């Protein structure tokens, strides 16, 4: 069986991570949560009260990012600290576009992601996987959904985790993040020329997963 590379890109809350995790489990692939890696960098910036990219990188080099299978799914670790929940707070979410747009941060993360992906048998999701991180990926998906639907998804996710959230404010924040991600100079959100556009508005997670898995199995 061929060890393929799958890249799933798309805007915030389009369902990329949820879909990628399910496909990884179903097809026996490694799931590399690139968004979580940038969220870790953002968390470090907030906790260390710095926007100095070299200091953020040095901290992560001293406390490496790793992923582990926990009781409730994949866990994100920084050194020995479990940051799975804290990197999903609104404070981190609203600052991640700024930190992830730093050239030094992106170069550091991309190098790490490419190193891990070299062996294949991997699925990654993010903003620039198909265009920058894995331009040679066997299968590229660009997953989109309406702002209203994405806000509703994030709203329900936050409530289930006990995070107080205002739905209308979420809509504004997601639309603004779309704008920032699309116009930033370094690796803007952009569909790769050879990516398959998949609009998930009104579709169930099961339907999205099935569509992508059918494409992937033909390449394995």
UniProtKB/Swiss-Prot annotation:
Pfam families found in the cross-reference section: Cytidylate_kin
Any single Gene Ontology cellular-component annotation: cytoplasm
Disulfide bond annotation, renumbered to this chain: none
Keyword Secreted in record: no
One GO BP annotation of this record: pyrimidine nucleotide metabolic process
Enzyme Commission number: 2.7.4.25
GO molecular function: ATP binding; CMP kinase activity; dCMP kinase activity
Location(s), subcellular: Cytoplasm
NCBIfam families assigned: cmk
The protein's name: Cytidylate kinase
Organism: Lactococcus lactis subsp. cremoris (strain SK11)
